[in-house]
Amino acid sequence: PTVRLMIFLQFLCNFAMTGIGPILPLYIRGMMGGDAKAVATIVGIIIFLAGGSSAMASLHVDRLTARHPMHQILISASAVCGVLFILQYMMPNVWGLGFFRALTGMFMGMIMPISNTIITLAVPEEKKGTVFGITTSLALWGNVAGPVFSGALAMKFGYGSVFWSTAFIFFFVTLLIRLQHKKVREAQARA
């Protein structure tokens, strides 16, 4: 169950980061109006900030895991991602949206390497190739499913629904991680 949850978490991170793709230019254009070139530049900057902060967090997550248990970091990062998606929606201007998008990228950058580490520790050596093949495939599927789902959701319920539904999914995952960790702790106590 832990490995499946970590694979789902990787799918979700890719789903969430790319899911906003179809609506971000339209959402920003609605916020600021203006010409398409300015909107395209701002969207590019926001995507760059989110990706850059995610990469920087991934590079330094080992320092954090040296001081805090991995499950606590995952719980915190998932919950914070949920809050940050709500804050992105609530921002009155593109710079606030960009700031919270970059923070979201930072917390997602903590999730991916930690979930990979947990998978590595939980899977027997002879099954790692298969498990990481599945993990990569599902993570890449998140890159496709995110924009499809978000586009359909935005078309039916408006742009805000994309932010709220993604936040809800992160809160749900936070709960799943907590419950899974509790089960593991209880099983270890019985052993």
Describe every region a protein language model picked out.
Residues 2-20, 102:
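Pair of pore-lining "gating" transmembrane helices in MFS-fold secondary transporters
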Residues 22-41:
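Short amphipathic helix-loop junctions that connect adjacent transmembrane helices
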Residues 28-29, 64-65, 152-158:
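Interfacial helix-cap and linker-helix signal at transmembrane-aqueous boundaries
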Residues 56-69, 154:
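Helix-to-loop junctions at the C-terminal end of transmembrane segments
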Residues 72-87, 164-167:
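Structural signature of the two symmetry-related core transmembrane helices
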Residues 84, 95-104:
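Paired small-residue
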Residues 110-123:
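Intracellular juxtamembrane helix-capping segments at the cytosolic ends
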Residues 152-170:
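A membrane-interface helix-boundary motif in multi-pass transporters
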